[in-house]
Amino acid sequence: MMNIKVSDDQAKTVKHNVGVPMPTTAAHRGLAERLICLHDEIKGDDSLGGLNRIAIALYDESSDILKTFIHSSDGDNPLEHSTAKLSEMPGLKLLARMGGRRTLNDLEKVALAGRDHAIRLVASGYRSSYTVPIQSKGMFYGFLFLNSFETGFFTAPVLHRLRPYAELIAQIVMRELDTVRMMQAAVKVIRQVSTVRDEETGAHLARMARYTRAIALKLAPRYGLNDEFVEYLFQFAPLHDLGKISVPDHILLKPARLTPQEFNIMKGHVARGVEIVDLMVGDMGLQSLPHFPMLRNVIAYHHEAMDGSGYPYGLSGEAIPLEARIAAVADVFDALTSARPYKEPWTNDKAFDLLRSQSGTKFDPDCVAALVDSVATIGDIQARFDETVYD
């Protein structure tokens, strides 16, 4: 077990604040709103007034998925909550591998060739496109897409004017993502150097993160969740049980039911997780960590229950942050359907039945319904991140 020391003053501050969920609504629009402001600034240049859309798509190498992230659009955003396999997009795949830029000054011709993304862009009025891969030091992050309602907009003079803005946007995105990755790497090191041998396998964390994403995408229309919210929840969900590194192995790995005293010790991992992440953010100078309130809320409240019977604060209903309610369903589902030394894995249907039976009491009904409605996605995740293959 790792011994992480927290001063009395630090502990009091954490415990005083953690019982009240941190507001996340405004923070979730952080990078997107900055992009909107920059878009307005760009259009202030008379020669660039026809730039009608800026969008970022991120790449998940482990699943070969290119997914929409943030955008600033004058008209509709036809590609929100979209994903596609990069390997099935030859043009973008080549661009990611070779670098360079791609200019398409007549999207209608591309749409006639049956390209789905081009068809959707044209249907929303866009007529030209300019694509820039976001990459640095051998790492590929995704793409920057620029679009105009005008056919032939991206001329050589326009591209010359746009180049510094494109580089600035790419740098902003990479800096934000690098901050998140730094936190993830630090947590991974903590797990590795501690003596804890918990059940948080790499495959479990990969699956759990993708289940949270699947749930969030289903909930997006009803709750008004943008791609930025979905992406950061995907990034932060695997850190939910960070505090378990402070739980003794004989309790954490016990194959039988815990005694009341042992369960009280186990429950302490929530507060410890918040303490640890607060200290890491402070000590590592990560105060700019994007959407820190979301991360903190996931760690602090994913063991709360809709009827108030959860721990450690006894919150109920919508007092529990949505991100924590989503993470709770994803975490329990993967625990049920995973093999453990003391149990066989449940079938998906059996796990769904249990979640449904506790919908509205333990779990958010919307989150349960969203997961159950993602059967095909769940199957793909389980096949791709099988314990025997991924770990």
Role assignments for model-derived ranges:
Residues 1-37, 48, 179-189:
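Signal-transmission linkers at sensory-effector interfaces
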Residues 1-4, 41, 101, 137, ...:
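Signal-transmission/dimerization alpha-helices at domain junctions
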Residues 2-6, 141, 147-163, 173-176, ...:
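Regulatory loop-to-helix N-cap segments in sensory/regulatory domains
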Residues 17-23, 27-46, 54-56, 208-215, ...:
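Amphipathic alpha-helical coiled-coil segments that mediate homodimerization
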Residues 40, 52-96, 238, 242, ...:
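GAF sensory/regulatory domain recognition
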Residues 76-122:
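Regulatory sensory and allosteric helical modules in signal-transduction proteins
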Residues 110, 196-391:
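Metal-dependent catalytic cores of enzymes that make or break cyclic nucleotides
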Residues 127-135:
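A short, aliphatic-rich beta-strand micro-motif
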